[in-house]
Amino acid sequence: EEDRSGIPFSGEDGKLLTLMLSYIGLNRNNCYFSNLVFWRPPGNRVPNKEEIKICLPFTREHIKIIQPKLLVLVGGIAANSILNFSESVTKLRGREFSYQIKEKKIKVHIIYHPSFLINSPIEKKRTWFDLTEISKIIENEKY
């Protein structure tokens, strides 16, 4: 679906992500989405290190141009690549990190990827908790 539309998170993953956003009062019109890798790897596999290495500078430039007040990284590959970590989402979610752009620090939160949640519905409860925390940040900061 994403290949046809050119829009990140447009298939089943996208439907769940849209629902998740609506839970905290957001929608696709007041958020910016970008994939870490700008093409679908063959066989819908996880992007390899070389593909990430090629695309990461462009993704970082997107973040620099957009200048978000809050960055929500979706899934472990995005989180580990952007923040230069090597941890599971399970260890990273529920915590606040920062991403530096020049002199500005951007708050970062990490959530499970919707495809993971579709296959592991038990983790949805943790994700709703994470979204509630993100919602509080948005409300407190008046984004």
Predicted regions and their residues:
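A polyanion-binding, active-site-adjacent surface
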Residues: 1-143
